[in-house]
Structure formats: structure tokens, C-alpha cells
Amino acid sequence: MNTTEKKEIKNFRDRIDKSIIRKQKSMQEHIELLSHKNIREVDKEKRLAILKSTLQQAVELEFGTIPIYLCALWSIKDNLDPIAKSIRNVVQEEMLHLALACNMLTSIGGIPKIYDTTPKGLRYPTKLPGGVHPELTLKLSGLNDDSLDDFLEIELPQGEIFIEEFKGKYHDANEHGEHSNTIGALYTAIQNEFESLNPTMLPDKQISGPLAWFVVDDFKKIKSAINWIKEQGEGAIEATEEDIKIHELSHFYRFLEVRKRKKIEKDPVTGKYSFKIDLPFPDVWPMAVVPEGGYLKKDVSSEVWDLTHQFDLTYSSMIHTLESAWDQGGQAALWKAIDMMFNLEKFAIPLMKIPIPGKKGNYGPSFRLIKY
């Protein structure tokens, strides 16, 4: 090893030390650190600290999209509408992804953190955690073309989009083909570091159960968990058209169907997939974008405030319960949290039926965490 190489390694180690101390790191920084050619020259405990930080970011990313998808779902008047069913499945799968990310973090001694009432906690509108898709701001609103454009950006595949040429709302910010700032890219870096570091993985406090959550205690299961997340969300990196089955569309292609008002169908002659059958857009409550900080008591009627406050209280309790599942609560706490999440609609939907005086659109939930 020559002097230049030794200096590079020292500089990288110093960078790792500074990164561990710094609380807020971008997704790109996590990817760069885990993928750096000198990562193997770093002390194992420090590499483990970076991996834990990266997995915590994955947990925040998986959870961060759920409220905006729930708003879209609840705004659909007929909950049996095919599009409502599709979005409901997306939410359920995002919960699965969250559970798998929490299991991966717990497997190496980390503690998933979601409940955060400090100014650094999740508040809408917001950027995706870690600087993923920095051009995008997550907003709480009903189902419409603007929200669908945001959903497509969130679920943008890391690999090629093969149904047809895709130009999204933020196409000037992306070079389509290989996308380096996607959630899939983050998981690729996580998988590679698990393989390289080969940490001891413990099943303690992980969750497994009937909804296909499973304990990750070796690299094979890590790889399975990450592949599952990628394929259900953005779509498989190496997917071919034969991999896409109509009833198993990734989130990106499900949202693309709704945006195009067309179902993706396979041509029995050519074997190619394209947009064919009309997909009627559902009748929705016109939920307006929730303002920064949410709706305040002084600005709304007592009816709106009661619904808003009850929603926030229940939501906060749900998040607290969800987080406890990977501490002491286990499967029972997770089931309780999921049940609470879907019960939030009894406050959200009545809000969505109330027009905002003097403005366009209706009210909706603010998804505020309350300290209790």
C-alpha cells in the first residue's frame, strides 16, 4: 500500500467518524459510504453504526409515504372501487416493507424510531427522508393527477421503465434508465453492505406472522426481504416484461394505470404489455392540500377541530404502539397498530366531506404527532 492509498483510507475513516457523529445524513451520503471502495478498511463497529443509520432511514422512508397514500384512499367515495382496492393493497404492502426494514434494523441491534414529536419529526408537507427525490415534496391531499404524479416519482423504478416512454412531473430532474436517488438504490447499498460486513443477526425482538413478515437472521433472508420490497414497490431492477403479472403489478405500475386511466394488459400475440382497457377514475371527495402545520383550532369550526384533534390523538397512539412492536410489544402490538391505522378513516372521511369556507376543496387529516 503506497502513501497515497494510506492517505485515502485515513481520509475515508475520518469521514466515517464525522458521519457517525452527525445525526442528519442524506440518502446519497449513506449510499456513497456503504459503496465506497475503502469501506472494508473501516472498523467493523463503525461500519455497523453506518448500516444501522441507513436502515433507520429506510424505516422513515417506508413510513413516510403511508399517510399520503391513505389520504388518496380515503378520498375515494366507494371503498369497493377497483382503484380503492389497489391503493389499499399498496398501503398494506408498504406496512410489510416497513416491518421488514424494522426487522433488518433490529437484527443488528438497532431500535426503529418513528414516534418523534420534536421539530425533526415527520410533519407534512415534507421532503422524503434522507434527500430521496429532492425535487419532490410530500403533500397530504385527495386522489388527483397531481398527487398521482408525486406517487409515480416516489415509486420510480431504479431500472428501465418498459411499458412505454415515461416522462413524469419531474422528468427534468431525472435521467431515466438508471436512477441513483431512488429508494431501490438505497436498498441495493444496504444489501451489499450486509453481504460484505456479514454481521451477526439476532432474531430477538423481530416480528414474524401470517402476513408474510419473516425474521431475517442470515444474508439469504436479507436478500429475500430487499427483493420483495423492490419488486412490490418500484418494480424489480432486472424485471423483464414476463416478470410483470397483471395481478402483481408493482406500486409504480398500479399508479401509472390510474394516471393513464388505462389497465396494463398483455397482448396474447406479441406478449408485450401496453395500456388497453379503460380504467374509470373514481368519484372522490375533493380534499385540498393540507397547509403546513395542519389545520389550527383558531381557524376552523368546532366540528372540524374535533375531528382533526381526535384523528391526531389516535394517529399518535397508533405510531407509539407501532414503534413498541419492535421493543417489547411484538406481533400483538403490530396488529393493534394496523387496526388503529385503518380505523383512522372514521375521522378522516367525515373531514373530507366538509368544504373549506371561501376556498377550493375540502378539509382532510393533518397527521400530526402529539406528545402524550
Region spans (language model):
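Non-heme di-metal
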Residues: 2-372
